[in-house]
Amino acid sequence: MNNIHKTAIIEEGAILGDNITIGAFTIIGKNVKIGDGTIIDSHTLIDGKTTIGKNNHIFSHASIGTIPQDLKFNGEDVELIIGDNNKIREYTLFNPGTIGGGSVTKIGSNNLFMGYVHVAHDCIIGDNCIFANGATLAGHVECDDFVVVGGLTPIHQFCKIGTQVMIGGASAVAQDIPPFCLAEGNKAVLRGLNLTGLRRRFDNREDIDAIKHAYRELFEVGKPLQDVARELLDNDKNKYVKELASFVLNTKRGIPFNRK
């Protein structure tokens, strides 16, 4: 049974699952789908072609699914897809995709979006990520799983953030950040590996040691970056090293590190 406040507006055509809570003065648009067990607090707007999974909690004054902040947008059929078990805090802003970027913004599951986080058009976000207050993702940004972005940090459009990356607060990210790395600063540069995150996630110490060795070879010894990445991809048997090397070889915006 759903618990919908009498002042909430649910437009005809919206599809609601079971055991959903919708607070006072919230507006749900006609093309919205909401999965079982989701809680939507008061004064929230969910609009556009938006699909929200199960057991999410969307806090007050969030704006979800309103048209993208792209001057080229002209009313095309675009959408926003949100997975399960996300916590989306106050004053967050999520936009759908554009036809220039695949027409979809996609957010995974088990993420925490703190207050005032903006996820712009065509972003792709994985699972188990944390975005602290005021983090800003411009259009077409991709974040893999287990990413942590500090407060008040903007990420430039088209940047890709690898798995298990941690980015410090009040940084400015303008290039791609490889998996397992720390980045910080304005402009953000690599500051080593996210060893705390790696130790929490990996039981096998050999994996961590292999990633450490690969990081040194790539970013600390002064060899040509692409050559080292290609050698690691071809010859190293560790799957995480291969993931790191492949990311470096396929970067579109470059890697921000201090060259020797």
UniProtKB/Swiss-Prot annotation:
EC number: 2.3.1.129
Subcellular location: Cytoplasm
Any GO CC annotation of this UniProt entry: membrane
Reactions catalysed, as given in the entry: a (3R)-hydroxyacyl-[ACP] + UDP-N-acetyl-alpha-D-glucosamine = a UDP-3-O-[(3R)-3-hydroxyacyl]-N-acetyl-alpha-D-glucosamine + holo-[ACP]
Coiled coil: none
A GO MF term: acyl-[acyl-carrier-protein]-UDP-N-acetylglucosamine O-acyltransferase activity
EC class name: transferase
Keywords, in A-Z order: Acyltransferase, Cytoplasm, Lipid A biosynthesis, Lipid biosynthesis, Lipid metabolism, Repeat, Transferase
Pfam families from the UniProt entry: Acetyltransf_11, Hexapep
InterPro entries named in the record: Acetyltransf_C (IPR029098), Acetyltransf_C_sf (IPR037157), Hexapep (IPR001451), Hexapep_transf_CS (IPR018357), Lipid_A_LpxA (IPR010137), Trimer_LpxA-like_sf (IPR011004)
GO biological process: lipid A biosynthetic process
Pathway(s) per entry: Glycolipid biosynthesis; lipid IV(A) biosynthesis; lipid IV(A) from (3R)-3-hydroxytetradecanoyl-[acyl-carrier-protein] and UDP-N-acetyl-alpha-D-glucosamine: step 1/6
Function as written in the Swiss-Prot or TrEMBL entry: Involved in the biosynthesis of lipid A, a phosphorylated glycolipid that anchors the lipopolysaccharide to the outer membrane of the cell.
Entry similarity comment: Belongs to the transferase hexapeptide repeat family. LpxA subfamily.
Complexes and interactors: Homotrimer.
Protein name: Acyl-[acyl-carrier-protein]--UDP-N-acetylglucosamine O-acyltransferase
Organism: Aliarcobacter butzleri (strain RM4018) (Arcobacter butzleri)
UniProt lineage: Bacteria, Pseudomonadati, Campylobacterota, Epsilonproteobacteria, Campylobacterales
Name of the gene: lpxA
